[in-house]
Amino acid sequence: MPRVVSTGLVFFFATLLIASEIPKVSDRHWTRKYDPYFRKYSKRFFGPAIDWHWFKAQGIAESGLRENAKSWVNAKGIMQIMPNTFTELKKKNAQLKDVMIPRWNICAGIYYDSILFKKWEEDRKFLDRMRFTMGSYNAGFRTILRAQKVSR
């Protein structure tokens, strides 16, 4: 077996092992305090059929649902919104108030997800579009596009 493949398999199984130790989104380990916001804004920006747990899982991945989280690059709040991104989102959505208030942080994160989601072709499967959306949220839309071109 080539070295790259065996290294990839080791990484895959290590990731699987770690993931099996992380509590599920619905687990009581995670606070339910923000669930109404995840429900409300996922429906507002994605429609009633969307499973709001996508966005709670994103909040867990971004900050562990810590409302006062700040990253080394100054991303803020539960959804780890960059200040410049929040400023741009406020121009398009005047209801957004303060990035550090959980309600508006979650609203901004899901609103941004909806913008990214719409950038991916509609002929893609829903699951692929959501995965690309989540990847774009973290790495940037153009980064994901470049990675796709390299992988072809």
Show the residue positions of the predicted features:
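Hydrophobic h-region of N-terminal signal peptides that target proteins for export
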Residues: 10-20
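N-terminal Sec-pathway targeting helices
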Residues: 1-9
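Catalytic glycan-binding domains that act on GlcNAc-containing polysaccharides
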Residues: 20-152
